[in-house]
Amino acid sequence: MKVLTRTLFTVVLLVCVAQGCSEPASAPEEELRAWVARGIDAAENKERRKLMGMVATAYVDARGNERDDIEGLLRVYFLRQNNITLLPKIEEITIYDETAGKIVMTVGMAGTNDGVLGFSADAYRFALELEKDANEWQLISARWGELGDELR
């Protein structure tokens, strides 16, 4: 029992030390993590207007989508799904001059619907580009693809 307790204590101590050695998140990085959390919450609650408030009016992506196209995609997805659950994993946050940033993340998506199986599930990888305008982060462009596929 003493060996188990000592081993457990050592593991906990090493984890605490390792966390203490990592750099603290910068203010812009913390803001972007909070931005992602707000977006996930809005999507799970199917709050399209709240989500669109996070997208810049000048949004454009490599697929040729503009802001209105993204709103249409959200509208269709929200209408098709009865419930939505998202499991995000932020892989990387890059900050440029504290007014621009890039987030690379993987999101597991599951939803219940009225289809034959009654549910759908996918995993996507996203590369999001953001700008900070008037103290608010706004999505200006995005690339995405199913997990394992090329981002476009």
Name the predicted role of every residue range:
Residues 36, 55, 74, 107, ...:
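Hydrophobic alpha-helical core bundles mediating ligand binding, dimerization, or RNAP-core interactions
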Residues 22-25, 100-102, 120-152:
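Short beta-strand edge/turn micro-motifs at domain boundaries
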Residues 8-18:
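Bacterial N-terminal signal peptides
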Residues 19-48, 53-54:
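Short, low-complexity N-terminal intrinsically disordered segments enriched in polar/charged residues
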Residues 76-119:
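Surface-exposed, charged secondary-structure patches
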Residues 1-9:
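Bacterial N-terminal signal peptides that target proteins for export
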